[in-house]
Regions:
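Short metal-coordination and nucleic-acid-contact micro-motifs, chiefly zinc-binding Cys/His arrays
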Residues: 30
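Glycine- and acidic-residue-biased ligand/ion/polar-headgroup-sensing regions
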Residues: 138-141, 147-163
Length: 218
């Protein structure tokens, strides 16, 4: 069962379409996994739609104009446009993984590999809320212990990872900040959506040796 969710403010901003793109993707992925938050977003969207209808209520003398316009639109012949769907799977280390709908049309960089951890940066025009990537932890992989100079969001897509604070399954919306030092690891392998708004800060090992690893994560 999913135990980690966006807060109500994030869900409301998502329903109102006011989030930066990278955070919109994160919430959309979670909502695809989480029926509870999907229902909450549907309720929020319905409330927003009702408020817009009330604000834009048509005056009685203009109602026939709206009806005429609607009738004209409905009478137009429908046109079927073929849509080229991208392959909803990705491959890494000889394994195939299905992607959530929100990520299937997002361009990505080639995979970069450092040891048993890989990263593919998402190519987003809007990076105002940070850099978004796909991260893959191979079976037995562990990220060196670190804290954060900003916000770190990790959302498992396939597989499970854990740290000192718990275990996280596909759909969990895991937010961490500078108050948290942790060492994510996966026993059987885990593909994640990751969002960082600043580089991580390693708390163990030699910083110089880990600089390249930090660049890979960010």
């Amino acid at each position: 069962m999913i135990n980690f969710h966006p807060d109500n403010a994030l869900l409301a901003a998502y329903a109102a379409d006011t989030l930066p793109l990278s955070m919109t993707l994160a919430v959309a992925i979670h909502v695809e996994f989480c029926p509870t938050c999907a229902r909450r977003v549907a309720d929020l969207e319905r409330q927003l739609a009702e408020s817009v209808l009330i604000a834009d209520k048509i005056f009685p003398e203009e109602e026939h104009l709206f009806d005429d316009m609607l009738s004209y639109i409905l009478e137009q012949p429908s046109v079927t446009v073929p849509v080229q769907m991208e392959e909803p799977k990705i491959e890494i280390q000889g394994q195939s993984f299905w992607l959530p709908r929100a990520l299937r049309h997002i361009s990505r960089q080639n995979w970069q590999q450092m040891g048993n951890i890989g990263r593919s940066r998402l190519l987003l025009d809007d990076q105002s809320s940070g850099r978004a990537s796909l991260m893959y932890l191979s079976a037995g992989a562990a990220v060196p212990q670190h804290t954060h100079r900003g916000m770190e969001l990790t959302l498992p897509l396939t597989g499970v990872f854990r740290d000192e604070l718990g275990e996280y399954i596909p759909g969990d919306f895991v937010l961490r900040d500078a108050k948290v030092a942790h060492q994510p690891q996966s026993r059987d392998g885990c593909l994640c959506f990751a969002l960082l708004d600043a580089p991580v800060q390693f708390t163990q090992g030699l910083p110089r040796l880990l600089n390249g690893f930090g660049d890979l994560l960010y």
